[in-house]
Amino acid sequence: YTDKFAMSQYSAPPMSGPLVVRTFQKSVGKSPFDVFDQFEKQCTAAASIGQVHKAQKDGKTLAVKVQYPGISNSIQSDLRMVKPVANAMFGLPEKEMKKYFQEVEDKLLEETNYTLELQRSQEISTTCTNIPDIFFPVYYPEYSSPKVLVMDWLEGDHLKEFLDKKPSQEVKNRIAQALWDFYNHQLHTALAIHADPHPGNFLLQKDGRVGVIDFGCVKVVPEDFYYHYFPLLVPEIRNNQAVVDQLLSHIEIIFPQDSPAVKVELQTAFLEMTALLSRPFETENFQFTHEFIDEIYAKGEEIYQIPEVKRPTQPRGSKHALYVNRTYFGIYSMMADLQANISTHADLWSDKLKSHWGLEKA
């Protein structure tokens, strides 16, 4: 659902060299040729809301991300066109879908605020600085602005190019472990996640290290949502009916006005899917495969055939789950592409959730 609105779907033609210079000067107040020792007017990469140029300053190679002019207005215009399609897809009035639209629109517009991205980049890189095999570019506030973001230039391959070089499984496992630890640390320690696990946002090294770039899309996870959503990944909690009733009600899967039959059907379906998704967290080590991803897809198709899911009488599910689910499905897909075998370290956070719900001795 969120991918219908994702910035990856937005394509803009590259800016010409003169337009890049004008855009930079308007935002920063100086020409890029006055700020940097060297600046390449030809972009090296086009991103969803801007393009990246290479520059030199004091012997350092820098990446300069320049935002497309008018992109915020384009996003809002595109969303207005897509809303009727989404409403028809779910068969619900727009006012009942408003909270989901607002969540997506807020996230997309946040991506156009490079000052916010710089702040979050620095916060997350500081929080995750001790995670093995993960590294980040240094950001330069003194050269940046709300429409221009400057950071160190990182070398490395995106996932497809990396896999084309036939790395060893040992190196692939090391990369996967770094990504897994990076995401779980963010979520369970910082309650904020890099919510765009697109392969293009990671630069993979032949020694197994991972460079992380692009913090435009970050989902801050409310503590209240965290303690009502993630406990469902813990079998001891999922098997406690009294707690499950509270959780499913709080995250808006089940409502008081639902009939007993609908409650049973939805709870059964949701718990079956959660049990499948939580499989990696229930063992010390887990082997990701494409067959596992196919199993998730198949279960999703099966659940979609439930009448109250296919044509709901009211919106179901917390808005906060949109980007969390999108993030973890992206991670799972990357793990499968790497055919990774990882240590899940689930005990580092599952005990905290069991304690929160009074199930320490379960």
Residue ranges of model-derived segments:
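Conserved phosphoryl-transfer catalytic core
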Residues: E236-Q241
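Catalytic-loop of the protein kinase fold
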Residues: T189-P199
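Broad phosphate/nucleotide-binding scaffolds in NTP-utilizing and phosphate-metabolizing enzymes
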Residues: Y1-N184, L191, Q205-G211, F215-E223, ...
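Short amphipathic alpha-helical recognition elements used for nucleic-acid or partner binding
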Residues: H228-P231
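Hydrophobic residue at the +6 position relative to the catalytic HRD Asp in the kinase catalytic loop
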Residues: G200-L204
